[in-house]
Amino acid sequence: MKFEEQARAYRETIERYLASIYASFGEEPQKPIFEAANYSLLAGGKRLRPMLALEFCRICGRNPEEALPFAAAVEMIHTYSLIHDDLPCMDNDDYRRGRLTNHKVFGEGMAVLAGDALLTDAFAVAARAKLPEPGKIGEAIAILSECAGSLGMIGGQVLDIMSAQRACTEQEVLDIQSRKTGRLIVAPCVLGVIAGNGTEAQKEGAAGFASLLGLAFQIRDDILDVIGDAGELGKATGVDGDKNTFVRLYGLSSCEQLVKDYTARAIDCLKVFPDPSFLTELALSLTERKN
């Protein structure tokens, strides 16, 4: 199957699974929170993170759908982080993926709760995964928590806020973005290997690939904030001008080369897998993305 066909098939599988999560909760009194959560969860997007989980599971020799609970959990956590990022007390954004942000539609209080629900429910979804070795559920949950929590994505957000009023060093920017963006790309890759009953060497390869891909992804985001089209991005551009971004640190031309360098290094980490062609094409496609 060609790359685009496989990517489309993965997205369709992921969309169906995500749509089923809150639908299975029934007509509870808390239905408004399901609607608010679904508004953002089902808003589309690249579905990069869940796609990575499915492909790493497949490349380790298992049915990729066995990784769906992990894939969905990561996407739920990613979505909660976007809802909270958009709040007035954080980035104060009005648009996300071409439509009004969650708090603009449902109010700030409900948006906070929708994010909280997505984060909390994500762990229940992940815990339902049926692994070849059931004992590895605990390992998977621990990895997910660490990548999303104070040592991972949240930690990166904290460092970002703390450094907002000063210029950061190269190492500080790398540390912020490795946590803030990179760790939630590491999670689905490693969880996909766990779902696929992969080896320790494959877990390490997946983590290395994801860490480097995460940096390339963030640098491309920083580039698009400067040169991207707001219509294509589905959100405002130029909002990171005062932040400690890679573009501010290195300049546009150097960042374009850095994206290529980090992507090449990420692809090199895939040598422990039998057929990394899909992951290679996926990584390369991200270097030229417009949104």
Predicted regions and their residues:
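All-alpha prenyltransferase/terpene-synthase fold signal
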Residues: 1-291
